[in-house]
Amino acid sequence: MNVKKTENALSVTLKNFIKSESFGGIFLFLNAVLAMVVANSFLKESYFALWHTPFGFQIGDFFIGFSLHNWIDDVLMALFFLMIGLEIKRELLFGELSSFKKASFPVIAALGGMIAPGLIYFFLNADTPSQHGFGIPMATDIAFALGVIMLLGKRVPTALKVFLITLAVADDLGAIVVIALFYTTNLKFAWLLGALGVVLILAVLNRLNIRSLIPYLLLGVLLWFCVHQSGIHATIAAVVLAFMIPVKIPKDSKNVELLELGKRYAETSSGVLLTKEQQEILHSIEEKASALQSPLERLEHFLAPISGYFIMPLFAFANAGVSVDSSINLEVDKVLLGVILGLCLGKPLGIFLITFISEKLKITARPKGISWWHILGAGLLAGIGFTMSMFISNLAFTSEHKDAMEVAKIAILLGSLISGIIGALYLFVLDKRAALKK
């Protein structure tokens, strides 16, 4: 299969995903820059105070709510992880992760891209209070990485874009596992049993192919609360909920009805404005077309713009702001070096070496249309950790270790920026060299 066939095989969903994520990456970057500017301006006290503002309602002596920062990190980010879970489920069932042959190469690449950065960080920070931050450089920000790769346009093979997307999805799955295993404290088993009960009810609804999203979302709120109270980060509940959303589509009767409506519309007279009959037909077509979509597709379609243009930019604005002044101890343990080297060196080396070895051992096969030089370029772009790395840094370091958290955020910004610039320049030069050889 050549590159052209690969491009033709790229689904409409994947193309739309690339477009939305690439623009989202640029918007994300602007919000991160704005956060740094505000955090180092005369507005910095107001900026930091804003995120600690309690938001909720009072019932007697009880306050139900969180600080604005917790609403973003625990509640809104749960919606982001719900979308991530839906993407992972879709890829596992129908996409690039749906078979061992398709999934093995990007999954192994993601594994190498997580292990190497984690080991680099842990080696530099072993036996220090900051060693728990090894998960920070293990993540990849798909929005930023795709934003960079889309700016390069046709200079990058479509097959490489597909590989990077699949790698990032597998990386997200790995990040979820890391959060569940290593950033969970003080487990409360009674709440875990409650969460398990909710999951069983969701599984029954899925088995019965209940297509309305309302019961899933209502139970999802209950699941989020149980998981939040159990000591596991609540975003894990969102991923579990995503895997319970049905993916089956209804019978073909809706297709016949759509065809009949289309014929009726074609038979109506055309004019400058739509007639009442035409409007009614189009409304019916819209309803029937929506009914043909699976609940998973409907929810993913709804969440994609909210996540890309509201949740993630807001998360970036709330978390990327670090006041860079003389009070920051950049030498706290080796957090700065561990994160930067993990992202800029560990990611590309881990991805390149593990895929190279696995192909030589005939465990996996490199996708057609991608050279080893391309794999190295994708590895460099995978070093853009940003939002996922920021999220893990919030889990790894508590307020008692605030210095390490602030240094980690500076390191994430620097490491992601370096990876993005070097990766883009590398792929640009690679394309120029290939053009000169032709």
Curated annotation (Swiss-Prot):
Location relative to the cell: Cell inner membrane
Keyword Transcription regulation: no
One function term, GO molecular function aspect: sodium:proton antiporter activity
Transmembrane segments: 23-43, 62-82, 104-124, 133-153, 162-182, 185-205, 212-232, 302-322, 337-357, 372-392, 410-430
GO terms of biological process kind: regulation of pH
Main location: membrane
Keywords attached to this entry: Antiport, Cell inner membrane, Cell membrane, Ion transport, Membrane, Sodium, Sodium transport, Transmembrane, Transmembrane helix, Transport
InterPro entries, per database record: Na/H_antiporter_dom_sf (IPR023171), NhaA (IPR004670)
GO CC term, one of those recorded: plasma membrane
Catalytic activity from the UniProt record: Na(+)(in) + 2 H(+)(out) = Na(+)(out) + 2 H(+)(in)
Annotated Pfam families: Na_H_antiport_1
Keyword Nucleotide-binding set for record: no
Membrane topology, record value: Multi-pass membrane protein
Function: Na(+)/H(+) antiporter that extrudes sodium in exchange for external protons.
Family, similarity comment: Belongs to the NhaA Na(+)/H(+) (TC 2.A.33) antiporter family.
Protein name: Na(+)/H(+) antiporter NhaA
Taxonomic source organism: Helicobacter pylori (strain G27)
